[in-house]
């Protein structure tokens, strides 16, 4: 029937249930496509320098998705491409995922540890996503974290960047310390702090340049490039990188492995809540009774003592009362009575 009609006429003759089904199915595919495009994988650029035998921390934050089965790590070198870790399946000796939750429900941390690093670990590491049905994954040549490994017999590098803090916990309003030690000189160029990774990262402190007012440098020594973050809030949560830049050509020369900052809201204790829930000038009737009960009892005790003393005085003998109360006139009458007896 619809084959001989135009598209609008055909749709007009369809039952309402088919029209509803068409409306549901078409946006469904579009929304699924947009949700896949909303994914964003954030990882530091590097290069990072690690000594042979140490542990390498590779950070990766996926924004907009928390599906473990669709994320994996791939190492690309001049020789080949190798899968380092797959969150969906497989056994990878020496590689462990970082178990860490984020404050945002759709932001997930897919960072990994590589233990006992060797020279074979030199290369560029990509945190990539795949569709879950095939092993095809998308990688871009300008992304990934490059890693350099110093062997036991290699000469000392001209620069080391050490960020010893993997995780820092703070409370709203606190001042947080982010540690960075730079050993060596390297090429001429500044040291900068960044929050985040990829194109969305933000420069927060530039030694010798313009910086945010809430960040201050510590600089306890010439090698100390640590900073203080004052009055932190939930917006300050994230990963911070201490990075060395080369002035000519203007490029990133070396990066630290990053420090993750988590900020929690300041909580009020139960005792503080009791004191702050009611004004200090108000008091319940029970409280008034507790305060005034000792005072009332004290007044009753004093009154009772006074009554007992008055009662004891009124019951004294008449002779004692005459002697005690005799005045000058009474003394003369007593003297006259004694003379008459003589």
From Swiss-Prot:
How does this chain sit within the bilayer? Single-pass type I membrane protein
Q: Which residues lie on this side of the membrane: Cytoplasmic?
A: 309-342
Q: Tell me if DNA-binding is a UniProt keyword of this record.
A: no
Which residues have a glycan attached per UniProt? 116, 179, 231
> Domain named Ig-like V-type: which ranges?
33-143, 157-258
The Gene Ontology CC terms held by the record are: plasma membrane
Q: Where is this region: Disordered?
A: 317-342
Q: List the disulfide bonds.
A: 60-127, 180-242
Q: Which residues form the signal peptide?
A: 1-32
- State the compartments where it is located: Membrane
Q: Which residues cross the membrane?
A: 288-308
Q: Which Pfam families match?
A: V-set (PF07686)
Which residue intervals are topologically Extracellular? 33-287
Q: Which InterPro entries match?
A: Ig-like_CS_Receptor, Ig-like_dom, Ig-like_dom_sf, Ig-like_fold, Ig_sub, Ig_sub2, Ig_V-set
- Primary location recorded for the protein, binned into one broad class: membrane
Keyword Kinase carried by entry: no
UniProt entry keywords in alphabetical sequence: Disulfide bond, Glycoprotein, Immunoglobulin domain, Membrane, Repeat, Signal, Transmembrane, Transmembrane helix
Protein name per the record: Signal-regulatory protein beta-2
Q: Which organism is it from?
A: Homo sapiens
């Amino acid at each position: 029937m619809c084959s001989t009609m135009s598209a609008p006429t055909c749709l007009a003759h369809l039952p309402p249930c088919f029209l509803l089904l068409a409306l549901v199915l078409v946006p469904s595919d579009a929304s699924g496509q947009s949700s896949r495009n909303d994914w964003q994988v954030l990882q530091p650029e590097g290069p990072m320098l690690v000594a042979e035998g140490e542990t390498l921390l590779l950070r990766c934050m996926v924004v907009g998705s928390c599906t473990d089965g669709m994320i994996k790590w791939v190492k690309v070198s001049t020789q080949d491409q190798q899968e380092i870790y797959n969150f969906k399946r497989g056994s990878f000796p020496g590689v462990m995922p970082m178990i860490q939750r984020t404050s945002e429900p759709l932001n997930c941390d897919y960072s990994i540890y590589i233990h006992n690093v060797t020279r074979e670990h030199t290369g560029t590491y990509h945190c990539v996503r795949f569709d879950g049905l095939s092993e095809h994954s998308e990688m871009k040549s300008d992304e990934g974290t490059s890693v350099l490994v110093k062997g036991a017999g290699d000469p000392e590098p001209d620069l080391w960047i050490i960020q010893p803090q993997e995780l820092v916990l703070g409370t709203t309003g606190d001042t947080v310390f982010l540690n960075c030690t730079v050993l060596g000189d390297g090429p001429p160029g500044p040291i900068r702090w960044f929050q985040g990774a990829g194109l969305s990262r933000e420069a927060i402190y530039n030694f010798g340049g313009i910086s945010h007012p809430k960040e201050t440098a510590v600089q306890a020594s010439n090698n100390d490039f640590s900073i203080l973050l004052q009055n932190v809030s939930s917006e300050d949560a994230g990963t911070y990188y201490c990075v060395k830049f080369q002035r000519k050509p203007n490029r990133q020369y070396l990066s630290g492995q990053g420090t993750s900052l988590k900020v929690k809201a300041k909580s009020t204790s139960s005792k503080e809540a009791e004191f702050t829930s009611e004004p200090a000038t108000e008091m319940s009737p029970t409280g008034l009774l507790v305060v005034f009960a000792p005072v009332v009892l004290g007044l009753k005790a004093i009154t009772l003592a006074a009554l007992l003393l008055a009662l004891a005085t009124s019951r004294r003998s008449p002779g004692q009362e005459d002697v005690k109360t005799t005045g000058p006139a009474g003394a003369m009458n007593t003297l006259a009575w004694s003379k008459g007896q003589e």
